Amino acid sequence: MNYSFDHIRLFIAIDYSLESVGVTMFDVEKKQYHFLSYLNIKKPATASRAAMLRGIDDLTVVEYQRDPIATVKSREDGLFGWEQQHMTNVLHYNAELVRSINRVASHLIQNLQKRETCVLIENYSYSSQSDTLIQLVENTMEVKHHLLTSTCNMENFYCIPAPRVKLYVGKGNYDKYDMTTAFLGNVRSDDYIPRSSFYQYLLQNFHEHYLKERIKKGKQFNEVLSPISDVVDSYWILRYFLVLNELD
């Protein structure tokens, strides 16, 4: 890209999902990471995992509770009631997500300006088809609106294709387990990540607390439990962009 990032003081990368959003921030001057998880803790198991993450100095966990995402087909109150609740969620929770990002950013860097902030968000997978796809698009658009209003300028806003990030990390068919083990192994030789308290915590606790073996269609696979997978994915979005633009 023929664009100067000399004025950027903070990079923010976002991996968005409907129940767990992962965010990685990088302070350019201090060469330090800060991570954020915006997490629906309605399920007790998720709440327990969130509690274990408290006290990590470079990880902020913002907890909220709402009923799990449901499709129109599974709702008994019909389209009108479902749509009203859905739009209430879209407007409220995404505004709070961006407020949380801005609070952390302003704490990391005093007097941070919009023009000094670069935001990266994972692009849609246009081949995806699911009952929640439209919900994801509507939610993400609201996030983008708030980010461009209060966090960064349009010229510092980028959508990053997930396949390119996966290829950068290793292979295009990498799943969340592959991405997380690559993160823990520091496969791209990031000089700054070993300093991170979150990284060191995960090195010690990942296999015991955040990995679960499951069977799907008769095959065993390793599931990385939220919010870890989302935070790690946001880290790789950021690293891909920094390396692509020779900013690391």
Enumerate the predicted regions with their spans.
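Phosphate- and other anionic-substrate recognition elements at nucleic-acid/protein interfaces
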Residues: 1-248
